[in-house]
Each structure stands twice: as structure tokens, then as C-alpha cells.
Amino acid sequence: MKAAVIVFPGSNCDRDCKVAIERSAGARVEMVWHQETALPDDLDLIVLPGGFSYGDYLRCGAMAAQSPVMKEVVSAAGKGVAVVGICNGFQVLTEVGLLPGALLRNAGLKYVCKPVELDIVNGQTRFTAGYGEQRQAVMTVGNGEGNYFADEETLDRLEGEGQVVFRYKENPNGSARDIAGIVNKGGNVLGLMPHPDRAFDADLGSEDGAVLFRSIFQSA
């Protein structure tokens, strides 16, 4: 089992993701700098971590989406490799076109950092199958631009095709239809604002993030 964590200038959750994956799933994790033009071979998972890539200049995730390594990430996603974008990583996935919609400033115009309760809307994805009968999860958000937006037609399609994976029980940022995480149509690309990398050990207040990481490798 093998994963890669992409590191951009300004990433600050890359090491969190590495430790979370190693401890949750026992996978080998390689850190990949944004200027690389090739990914490690035989990857089961690629993670775009949280943080403030390129200082959030221009627009959150916009500059990271133009990094050389992202061409390889898009190519790997097209071949079915699992890709997870967490927080800033979710923003990058929308900027590069792997997921629809955009992440806007929080409705309250403030940075929000706190544990949130999530409904597991679709438990049949490769990211959520490990939750079994569990229908709620607790993870932590930490963002100023976590307000998911898409037009009504796109939102209807996401809901109708089972692409909404996580939904906030109490919306912290104004996200359309309380959406916290979505997958692409192929089911192998997940973007979510809550941090599974901050919920992989009981000492952190929740182990629900560990379930997500294990699910990925169990389905690989």
C-alpha cells in the first residue's frame, strides 16, 4: 500500500496527513514536491493537504492548480487512482477541474476552526465503505474559505448521482445544501473541507478520519 502527499509552498498539513495515513492504514507515504513532473509508481492514493498553498494569493488553490505536479495528479485520477483533497486541497481540486463548484469566503467572513458533526450521505464510496452502518462522523474544520458553491443544476446533479458524500449537521460556513464533501462522477476523487488528518486518534477527539483512510486502501 502506497500513498503520495503533494507538498506546495504554504502547505501546513502535509506531515499531519503522512502520519495519519501511516498510523491509520499502515501504508508507505512519500512526500512529493510541487515542482516534480512525475509521481512515484504504483500509488494507491494521492493526497492534496490543507494549508495556504502559495499564500492563497490570487485565489485559494488557483496557483497550486498550475503547479507542474498537478498535470500528473490529473492524469493519475483519470486512470482511477484515488485522490483526496482536504481543505486547501479541495480548493485545488475545484480549480484544476477534477471536482465541480468553488469554495468561497465563509458566510460569516471569519476563519472557523472547530470540531463538526457530519452526516455520511453516501456510505458506498471507496472512501466511506469502511464506516459500515455508521451514519455520522466527527472531524475538525479549519478554514476561511470553506463555503462550497455551485449552481443549482450542478447541485441537483451531485445529489441525484450520489456524489455528495458528507454533509454538515450544523453548517459552519454557509456551504450550499450543507455540503462538506463530494466525489467526482468516477468515484475516485474526493474533496472535503473537514480534516480526516485531525481525526485519526482518540487523543484528538475522534478516530473517524482513520476510517476514511483505511477505507481507501481496503478498496484498492
Swiss-Prot record:
Signal peptide: none annotated. This is Phosphoribosylformylglycinamidine synthase subunit PurQ. It comes from Caulobacter vibrioides (strain ATCC 19089 / CIP 103742 / CB 15). SUPFAM superfamilies: Class I glutamine amidotransferase-like. Residues 3-220 form the Glutamine amidotransferase type-1 domain. The active site is at C87, H195. Keywords: ATP-binding, Cytoplasm, Glutamine amidotransferase, Hydrolase, Ligase, Nucleotide-binding, Purine biosynthesis. One of its GO terms (cellular component) is cytoplasm. HAMAP family: PurQ. It catalyses: N(2)-formyl-N(1)-(5-phospho-beta-D-ribosyl)glycinamide + L-glutamine + ATP + H2O = 2-formamido-N(1)-(5-O-phospho-beta-D-ribosyl)acetamidine + L-glutamate + ADP + phosphate + H(+); L-glutamine + H2O = L-glutamate + NH4(+). Its EC number is 6.3.5.3, 3.5.1.2. GO terms for molecular function: ATP binding; glutaminase activity; phosphoribosylformylglycinamidine synthase activity. GO terms for biological process: 'de novo' IMP biosynthetic process. It is found in: Cytoplasm. Part of the FGAM synthase complex composed of 1 PurL, 1 PurQ and 2 PurS subunits.
